[in-house]
Amino acid sequence: TTLFRSPVAAGLDFEATLSEEKRVLVVDIGGGTTDCSLLLMGPQWHHRRDRENSLLGHSGCRVGGNDLDIALAFKSLMPLLGMGGQTEKGIALPILPWWNAIAINDVPAQSDFYSTANGRFLNDLVRDAQDAEKVALLYKVWRQRLSYRVVRTAEESKIALSDRPEHTVSLPFISDDLATAISQEGLETALAQPLQRILEQVQLALDNGKEKPDVIYLTGGSARSPLIKKALAEQLPGIPIAGGDDFGSVTAGLARWAQVMFR
């Protein structure tokens, strides 16, 4: 049995477009993971069954598009629900309930947020907060289990900001007039931390490979984000960035490999 790393499979689809051997950095950013592989690719590798010798370096982590959406929801949407406020006595409200509310890829965090004990805590928080109306909206998220809808709204905002400088996001499922504007600058600030972790994986793959890529092949659901392309271009200036079928490249690559293995 041969197991293929997903960026290697994704890269095989891109390899079919090459007319000469190149060092290709494949960056595959999925929903929950980022995988990076530095590979030798080209016509001379097309019909090789064993690709181990073409793999120069690899790295990966459990950060992906979902983490970008969660970060945007936390930084840009949670303040609408009272995050960063104070009690009537001037004591800062704890941040954790707002984080747990949108940490949809963290089972313990979601279990804690939707626990009965946390419901009582949020009720007390509404009573004690200076801006009780805003904190009551977080309590509504708890009561109606709205976490996924909040993060989905953040994802839609991230997508909208791919081709415009500013986007107004509304959350009518929480409150009719609840809305805010998110700018490109706000998006960059919100996504800085998970984006940095993705760039660290790129650097790890390059450190493992000990060579500079000729081209970057960016794929996966988050590959369409101009912010990610910009960050990669800044990290690796002068290296062209190519793209393909962001959602189907792994499948297409595996199909090509199957033709080699079973022809």
Can you say where each PLM-predicted feature lies in the sequence?
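Glycine-rich phosphate-binding/hydrolytic loop that grips phosphoryl groups
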Residues: 6-17, 69-75, 193, 223, ...
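Phosphate/ATP-binding catalytic cores across multiple sugar-kinase/actin-like superfamilies
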Residues: 7-18, 153, 157-160, 189-214, ...
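Alpha-helix capping and helix-loop boundary segments enriched in small/acidic/polar residues
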Residues: 21-27, 56-64, 178, 182, ...
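Glycine-rich phosphate-binding loops at beta-strand->alpha-helix junctions
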Residues: 142, 146-147, 213-232
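Phosphate-binding glycine-rich/basic clefts of nucleotide- and phosphate-handling proteins
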Residues: 40-173
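Short, small-residue-biased leader/transition segments that mark boundaries at the very start
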Residues: 2-3
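Adenine-nucleotide phosphate-binding core of ATP-dependent small-molecule kinases
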Residues: 139-147, 176-206
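Gly/Thr-rich phosphate-binding beta-strand-loop-beta motif of the actin/hexokinase/Hsp70
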Residues: 16-49, 218
